């Protein structure tokens, strides 16, 4: 029945987004996580993006560390930047930046993801209507030379100063840099 529904959508000319297959491997609670400066939910996920799939526009309200173990995945930022990662490479999708995953290859792209987020926050928030959004800005540099004008998520900015203030006033966590005491 599911295959018939997909065939009907394809025939009608409607774009069918993403046969992206997530599998939650483990979920745990960390009572005092440095990345969230308090209690955090930690989730391990296995994600398969099949050839030709284009994910929906979304963001993650927390930290996400990703490792590609097979195939190639392209991450398209809502502001137009793209990065491509192949098996053996790792990347982050953090700070609430809008993005989507694309598999332009001929084999499955397989990733393992670790989500670290404030307790009670979801893994992912979908952008309503699957509309491309740019933002939020992560650095003051992104606000300069007219860069402020491209951002429309979570809101627009009237000028460079307003964009820079948004970046500078975002909550931050300070972490000690881990050291190997024997080296």
What is each model feature region?
Residues 49, 78-96:
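Short acidic-glycine-tyrosine-enriched beta hairpin
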Residues 122, 132-183:
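Soluble extracellular-acting proteins and domains
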């Amino acid at each position: 029945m599911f295959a018939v529904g997909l065939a009907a959508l394809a025939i009608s000319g409607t774009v069918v987004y993403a046969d992206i297959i997530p599998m939650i491997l483990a979920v745990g609670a960390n009572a005092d996580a440095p990345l969230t400066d308090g209690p955090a939910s930690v989730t391990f996920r296995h994600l398969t993006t099949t050839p030709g799939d284009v994910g929906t526009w979304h963001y993650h309200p927390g930290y996400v560390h990703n490792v590609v173990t097979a195939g190639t995945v392209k991450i398209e930022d809502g502001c137009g930047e793209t990065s491509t990662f192949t098996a053996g490479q790792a990347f982050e999708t953090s700070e609430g930046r809008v993005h989507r995953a694309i598999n332009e290859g001929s084999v499955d792209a397989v990733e393992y993801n670790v989500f670290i987020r404030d307790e009670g926050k979801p893994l992912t928030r979908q952008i309503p209507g699957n509309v491309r959004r740019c933002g939020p800005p992560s650095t003051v540099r992104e606000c300069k030379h007219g860069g402020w004008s491209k951002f429309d998520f979570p809101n627009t900015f009237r000028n460079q100063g307003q964009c820079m203030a948004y970046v500078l006033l975002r909550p931050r966590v300070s972490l000690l840099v881990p050291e190997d005491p024997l080296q």
